Amino acid sequence: MATAHHTDQLHSLQTHGIHCGETTIPSQGDELPAYIAKPDQHTGPYPVVIVVQEIFGVHEHIQDICRRLAKQGYLAIAPELYFRQGDAKDYSNINELVNNLVKKVPDRQVLVDLDHTAHWASRHGGDTKKLAITGFCWGGRIAWLYAAHNPQLKAAVAWYGKLVGEKTLFLPKYPVDVAIDLCAPVLGLYGGKDTSIPAEHIETMRQALRAANADAEIIVYPEAGHAFNADYRPSYHAESAQDGWQRMLDWFTQHGVSAIPIPEETQ
């Protein structure tokens, strides 16, 4: 069992060389909670990566992704996009979480919150002329949608986000519907063993992207399932996750969202 001293040491390693913590962002008449991480070895401004949560909210795994990006030289920020409808931590059953909370969060609300997040970042050390987004699971779908929403976005990376699905008043479109509207290059990272996103859905999306002549690429990892980057779950597939992480960083750089060089001792 981990001791308090061990836990403190681990947290110190995770936060060495960066500033990180909770903040709030004015958005749509509310104060939107968010987690932010950025380097402390440079005056900025920093290229910005918006990190969009899994269905479980901005929990430790998403915060860790922000810290990892900060150690690469980015200002990374993850807004709590469910906060008006509820708190994911209040649910222990995934089906109840999805039906009672996640499905009640309107896409329109989410996209505007992300706009306000980008604006806030531009006033707090971020360079939104170098703006990217990445999202996981629920957030992977949102990353596709945001790439068709914000013309200032330079790059997007969507990790195992649903591509097609049942449309509702709150979820009127899926990535396959916005392929023709993409205004930023998108990299999709998917698992070949993901039963929730079958191969035919991926092929449908690829066809839509080709028809739209979109600047996008989908990578499928044959041995990975859903949530293969979630290193706190049995679904984690280290080889695919590590390759996907490097592809994400390369995608950002390739499309004009290069990280600020950070001294190796802070990484």
From Swiss-Prot:
Pfam families: DLH. It comes from the Bacteria. It is an enzyme of class 3 (hydrolase). InterPro entries: AB_hydrolase_fold, Dienelactn_hydro, Dienelactone_hydrolase-like. It catalyses: 2-(5-oxo-2,5-dihydrofuran-2-ylidene)acetate + H2O = 4-oxohex-2-enedioate + H(+). The active site is at C137, D194, H226. Keywords: Hydrolase. Its EC number is 3.1.1.45. GO terms for molecular function: carboxymethylenebutenolidase activity. Belongs to the dienelactone hydrolase family. PANTHER family: ALPHA_BETA-HYDROLASES SUPERFAMILY PROTEIN, CARBOXYMETHYLENEBUTENOLIDASE-RELATED. This is Putative carboxymethylenebutenolidase. It comes from Yersinia pestis.
